Curated annotation (Swiss-Prot):
Keyword field: Cytoplasm, Hydrolase, Nuclease, Ribosome biogenesis
Family according to the record: Belongs to the YqgF nuclease family.
InterPro entries assigned: RNaseH-like_sf, YqgF, YqgF/RNaseH-like_dom, YqgF/RNaseH-like_dom_sf
The keyword Cytoplasm belongs to this UniProt entry's keyword annotation: yes
Tagged with keyword Hydrolase: yes
Protein name: Putative pre-16S rRNA nuclease
Length: 182
């Protein structure tokens, strides 16, 4: 199941906050960026309610409310892939939620122009998020309640870093570094 993620910087909506989503079968982790689109921060974990054959439920409504609340100019939905880049079995869930958000935003008259909903490569984000939580001393029980938010932060931060590189030719970590001749 080969599914290609979107490329940052293409049709970029410009400055503003971005929302990042880690879609699971039980929960959806949510993260938001600062207005400069440099730093991702956790927001909340939304309980997943909408299935493939269901009408939109409270989870979709909550995600739309967050898009409006943060005035998001772009939404980055994690695209689960294995290390070879192939889509995992969870791809269908992420694509379904992205589709429903796009559809609802297109009909939403609260926004002049709906923000683009991007599919973002999320390889190893949950592994990285879990390791970071354990390293910071978060208990396994407490970790379950925030792991989806941490994964959403990883997804969004990777998108922000790649976006910055695509638009500026360097990563945010070396902003201000000078290239010195030998």
């Amino acid at each position: 199941m080969a599914v290609e993620p979107d490329k940052p910087g293409v049709d970029d909506p410009g400055p503003g906050r971005r929302l990042g989503l880690d879609v699971g079968t039980v929960r959806i982790g949510v993260a938001v960026s600062d207005r400069d689109a440099r730093l991702a921060m956790p927001v909340e974990t939304v309980r997943r309610e909408t299935g493939f054959k269901d009408r939109d439920k409270d989870d979709i409504d909550r995600l739309l409310d967050l898009i409006h609340e943060y005035d998001a100019v772009e939404v980055a939905v994690g695209l689960p892939r294995d290390l070879k880049g192939n889509g995992s079995s969870s791809v269908k869930h992420a694509k379904e939620i992205a589709f429903r958000i796009r559809r609802r935003l297109a009909k939403d008259d609260r926004m002049k122009e709906p923000p683009p909903v991007r599919m973002v490569d999320e390889r190893l984000t949950t592994v990285v998020a879990t390791s970071a939580l354990r390293a910071s001393g978060v208990s396994e029980k407490r970790g379950r309640s925030v792991i989806d938010q941490a994964a959403a932060v990883e997804i969004l931060q990777s998108w922000l870093d790649a976006r910055h590189f695509a638009l500026n030719g360097h990563s945010p970590s070396n902003v201000g570094d000078e290239v010195r001749e030998p």
